């Protein structure tokens, strides 16, 4: 089972679209989409990782 990765190299972004493609972070928080998740990854200095796709 390979680790799940999301490419956040083009983040942070000042605004995210309101698309609903939830991701579950390693903080056990559900993020609405890749953009909001990647912004949180940047804010966490890379300590936040993706647990899985879908809601936590």
From Swiss-Prot:
Its main location: secreted. Disulfide bonds join 8-38, 16-35, 24-56. SMART domains: KAZAL. The record marks 18-19 as: Reactive bond 3. Residues 6-56 form the Kazal-like domain. The keyword Calcium does not apply. Keywords: Disulfide bond, Glycoprotein, Protease inhibitor, Repeat, Secreted, Serine protease inhibitor. It is found in: Secreted. The keyword Transit peptide does not apply. One of its GO terms (molecular function) is serine-type endopeptidase inhibitor activity. Gene3D superfamilies: 3.30.60.30. GO terms for cellular component: extracellular region. Glycans are attached at residue 45. PROSITE patterns: KAZAL_1, KAZAL_2. It holds the Pfam family Kazal_1. Avian ovomucoid consists of three homologous, tandem Kazal family inhibitory domains. This is Ovomucoid. It comes from Penelope jacquacu (Spix's guan).
